[in-house]
Regions:
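Thiamine diphosphate
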Residues: 71-74, 138-351, 422-501, ...
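Cofactor-binding active-site loop characterized by glycine-rich and histidine/acidic residues
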Residues: 47-50, 54-212, 223-241, 519, ...
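Glycine/charged-rich beta-loop-alpha catalytic/anionic-binding loops adjacent to active sites
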Residues: 54-59, 128-143, 175-182, 240-244, ...
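Phosphate/diphosphate-binding glycine-rich loops and adjacent basic-rich segments that engage nucleotide
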Residues: 514-610
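A generic, well-ordered mixed alpha/beta core segment in the N-terminal half of proteins
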Residues: 81, 91, 99-122, 144-145, ...
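Conserved acidic/glycine
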Residues: 1-73, 78-80, 283-438, 448, ...
Length: 727
């Protein structure tokens, strides 16, 4: 017999016989009415788990990682307000069923079963995935098994007090809300969880408000690996700035009492707390997990003896709230409800086409207040003496600084965050004076942890802010890429566009820094960004474009709720000259306030029959090469694609109309570089002869060989000449 059926039959038999596991007497402030509501949610969650397994075995359901053994989370839901944002562990079905009962109009059994069956009418994901979550219940969807939702929970909690001082237009959380995030004991060991909890402690230690409740659901095992006894308590009980609470998660009275105290502490003190619940795991990790292959039978039989529903039944009967017959009636009623609803659910349509699946990758547009831009008085106050320099040509670094200033003046919901972004003004000085102009609330110096930086941004976006996080160097993004790839980029997809986290992520990157940094400060690979569905990647090549593209990126985030990555070529920050020393050929005046470059709009210079398609540093070098090639009788047109993703195919094809040959110049590596996508597109949609010049598949060296592996003016000239002379 399946373990789920064994536990089910044991529950019915033991309640009927009055044979309950031992435990403490019921105590605390939990009312009988609330206790019954919690138990009903527990029973519903349990029977949803059982039904999901039956659906899966019949080919009608597609998810069997259940919440059985973790039903104590229903008591945690009761201890919180329904408007407290909750980032849930994947075993928190009971939390959702309990909160659902607190929100009028929700139908937990129907909704969860629709999710199990991946029905198009699933109210959260639209049939794309089985995820816990609900817009009405303030539960953003989570699918993570590695605690990657903890960093954004920290960010969301941080946003609450920030929103009091700087109310964003699209504010979500109330001023006295708290944020809850839950995770398993195994996930607590993951670097992402460790980093997020450390960030919460670091923040709280400095008396910065952070109303966040961590809930660790400790069932002593992660798939097959046991958690050392006492490990969670020893690890988290004495963290600076973090209050530790411990409860028996099998006891709904104890769990409610302690969870209520923890929530009250967080809400009143505006400090983070860690609620440690002792639980059991029933049935194994998932339906396909045969726990008997790695656990002694006596171990999981002991867990089954401690079934939390049996503990709840004992407590409810001992306290006189319910009789044994009433306990069984609730359990059987929810079982029959799940069976009845499942028969209806399996008749629902499922997604079948790529268009249907992809429909929610790009989030919906939203209504935003119209603005007239910052006033001249505000600009004069903010810029000071800098405003006198705006009519003179400047390098990219200064122009980006001015663009950020104007944007922050116009949109008070913009918040910047990174290591050294504030008082220092950034490693390259791009954010100089911004902290003085807008204060430490809006230009935040963070601790050194890229996952926490991006998590802070995602969390702020959940509460209506427009975050502008910065990653100091492109190579450092790899430390935290899942925060974009697995979290930010998937939110609209998994919520059918109901939840969004718009942002503009600035990354200083690419190569060609003279004699500085080697690989870790010069990374010429954008592959990690290019294939993330829905993410926009921009890369300006000079200051004027940087300003105009940054304005468009901000608009895309604010109005279209997009996740945008803005890659700033480090080597071009200070670039002044193009061909000759002091020619000022790569400096530009500050663009007028109404100027921008639209998504997909490419830049074109020249109209020669040989087209060079490039971006970033490649554009700069191609301009140098074009001058020499012209002297040799080869006329060039240069197409700066500007937008790395999505590839601006229509703009590129229009720009090369009339050309005879095409050379793709890619400063990124030959393997995984942008040239691969360009070559594929041109092969599919154009008959022109095409060649490419890309960087070697190599890391970047420090010292005189800093550019040896990447395209140069000379190599572009040689490649263009060879292509042009090829019949």
């Amino acid at each position: 017999m399946d373990r789920a059926d064994i536990v089910h039959e044991a529950f019915l038999a033991r309640v009927s016989a009055g044979e309950f596991p031992s435990g403490d007497a019921p105590y605390g402030p939990l009312s009988g009415f609330e206790a019954v509501a919690i138990f009903r949610a527990q029973c519903l969650s349990r029977n949803l788990d059982r039904r999901s397994r039956k659906m899966q075995s019949a080919g009608q359901g597609f998810y069997t990682i259940g919440s059985s053994g973790h039903e104590g989370m229903a008591a945690v839901a009761s201890a919180l307000r329904r408007d407290d944002m909750a980032f849930l562990h994947y075993r928190d079905g009971a939390f959702q069923t309990r909160r659902s009962a607190m929100v009028p109009g929700t139908t937990p059994a129907w909704d969860m079963l629709l999710s199990f069956s991946t029905a198009k009418s699933d109210p959260l994901s639209g049939g794309r995935h089985k995820v816990l979550g609900s817009k009405a219940m303030n539960i953003p969807p989570q699918t993570s098994t590695i605690a990657s939702h903890l960093p954004k929970a920290v960010g969301a909690a941080y946003s609450i007090s920030l929103a009091k001082r700087h109310p964003p237009e699209h504010k979500v959380l109330k001023d006295d809300s708290i944020v809850m995030c839950s995770f398993g004991d195994a996930s607590a060991n993951h670097s992402t969880a460790q980093g997020a909890i450390n960030t919460a402690c670091w923040t709280s230690y400095q008396s910065v408000p952070l109303p966040l409740l961590f809930v660790c659901e400790d069932n002593d095992i992660g798939i097959s690996t046991r958690t050392p006894q006492g490990w969670i308590g020893a690890s988290f009980a004495n963290k600076p700035g973090l209050k530790y609470f411990k409860a028996n998660g099998l006891d709904l009275f104890d769990t409610f009492c302690v969870a209520q105290a923890a929530a009250e502490y967080v809400r009143k003190r505006k400090k983070p707390a860690f609620l440690h619940l002792s639980l059991v795991r029933l049935y194994g990790h998932a339906g396909a997990d045969l726990q008997q292959t790695y656990l002694a039978k006596s171990i999981f039989e002991e867990w089954e003896q401690n079934d939390p529903l049996l503990h709840s039944a004992r407590l409810l009967t001992e306290s006189g709230v319910l009789t044994a017959d009433e306990v069984l009636s609730i359990y059987i009623e929810t079982e029959e409800q799940c069976a009845r609803v499942a028969e209806e659910v399996i008749q629902q349509q499922r997604l079948s086409t790529s268009q249907e699946v992809m429909a929610s990758i790009v989030p919906p547009k939203r209504e935003c207040k119209l603005t007239n831009g910052p006033s001249e008085e505000a600009r004069e106050t903010a810029f000071g003496s800098d405003i006198q320099q705006m009519e003179k040509p400047q390098n990219m670094s200064r122009l980006i600084n001015w663009a950020l200033t104007d944007l922050m003046l116009e949109y008070p919901e913009i918040i910047m965050m990174s290591e050294d972004v504030g008082r220092k003004g950034g490693v390259y000085g791009v954010t100089q004076k911004l902290c003085d102009r807008f204060g430490q609330d809006r230009v935040i110096d963070t601790l050194l942890d890229e996952q926490s930086i991006l998590g802070l941004a995602i969390g702020l976006a959940h509460n209506g802010f427009i975050p502008l996080p910065e990653i100091q160097f492109l190579a450092y993004f790899h430390n935290a890429e899942d925060q974009i790839r697995g979290e930010a980029a998937t939110l609209s997809f998994f919520s059918n566009g109901q939840f969004t986290n718009p942002m503009v992520l600035r990354i200083a990157g690419l190569g060609y820094q003279k004699g500085f940094g080697g690989h870790f400060h010069n990374d010429n690979s954008l592959a990690v960004l290019r294939d993330i569905p829905g993410v926009i990647v921009a890369c300006p090549s000079h200051g004027a474009d940087a300003v105009k593209m940054l304005r468009e990126c901000l608009r895309l985030a604010r109005e279209e709720q997009r996740v945008v990555v803005f890659v700033e070529p480090i080597a071009l920050y200070p670039m002044r000259d193009l061909h000759d020393e002091k020619d000022g050929g790569w400096m530009h005046t500050y663009p007028a306030m109404d100027e921008s470059v639209s998504l997909g709009e490419v830049g074109v210079t020249g109209n020669g029959p040989l087209a060079i398609i490039t971006y970033g540093n490649g554009h700069y070098l191609s301009q140098q090469a074009a001058k020499v090639l012209k002297q040799q009788g080869i006329e060039i047109r240069i197409v700066d694609i500007r937008w790395i993703a999505p590839l601006p195919a229509e703009g590129i094809l229009s720009a090369i109309d009339g050309a005879q040959k095409v050379l793709v110049v890619d400063e990124c590596r030959g393997t995984g570089g942008q040239a691969e996508a360009l070559f594929a597109m041109l092969t599919e949609r154009s008959d022109l002869p095409v060649a490419r010049l890309a960087a070697e598949d190599s890391f970047i060296a420090t010292g005189p060989a800093y550019a040896a592996t990447m395209p140069s003016r000379e190599s572009i000239i040689a490649a263009a000449t060879k292509l042009w002379n090829t019949l």
